[in-house]
Amino acid sequence: MVRAFAYEEIGETSTEAHASVEDNKRDRTRRVINYNLRSTTMISSLSKRLKIDECKNQDPEQNPNRVASSPSLCHVKSKRPQKGVSNKPILDMDFLNEEELEKIDRHYKKISDSDKGADVILVNSEGLQRKLKLKRWDMTSTSNYVLGSGWNKVVTENILETGTRLRLWSFHSPDMLFFALVLSDPDLAPTKDWECLNLLAKLTVETACLEASQDADTMSSLVSDTELDLELRL
């Protein structure tokens, strides 16, 4: 099922007519391009562009109220200096399953030294894969998800610079969470992102980590479930 991250809009407006036109364009694009991924719902909202802002090296603070926190997706440049998405709460957290949430929670609570967060594989448009860890950090007024244990290599390999516009999709193989990274050019036609996404899905299915998904039923279960636009600030 294809879903878009739902964000709380602050200071942004759009007309219903404009949203309807954009939805129709997305619907047509999916019908033409969607030959590798099986989508069951429309992306019903416009892509939200977010700016990755500095977390100012704040120390994580305990936040016992997990439900009330406002998590957002961000990345870690190194162990201490970290940077994250601006403080817009993610309203739809369904891109994580129960096992992944438990691993993230165990790392956050420091239950064991062996708890490192949830395993994630980031795939770029060339099919290059990088294993990362998805973790949770609580700041003074917000709770962030961070990508660590290899993000610096992602920046280098994809030549990411300040102001780079990129799009992250999440999807699951039978036992692994993937993030597909697509550099997003606002001047390109909307179909380009779908072409890149389908290419990523095809390349991912062919890798060794998805050997178990060679039968048709398992392969058909590989579906995109999250979309997020980001603007990188290093």
From Swiss-Prot:
Q: Source organism's superkingdom? A: Eukaryota
**Known DNA-binding region:** 87-185
Q: Which GO terms describe its cellular component?
A: nucleus
Subcellular location as annotated: Nucleus
| PROSITE patterns cross-referenced by the UniProt entry | B3 (PS50863)
Q: Where is this region: Disordered?
A: 55-88
Keywords from the UniProt entry: DNA-binding, Nucleus, Transcription, Transcription regulation
Q: Which residues form the signal peptide?
A: none
Please give one Pfam family short name: At2g31720-like
* GO terms assigned for molecular function: DNA binding
Query: By its UniProt entry, which PANTHER family does this protein fall under?
Result: B3 DOMAIN PLANT PROTEIN-RELATED, TF-B3 DOMAIN-CONTAINING PROTEIN
Name of the protein in its database record: Putative B3 domain-containing protein At2g18810
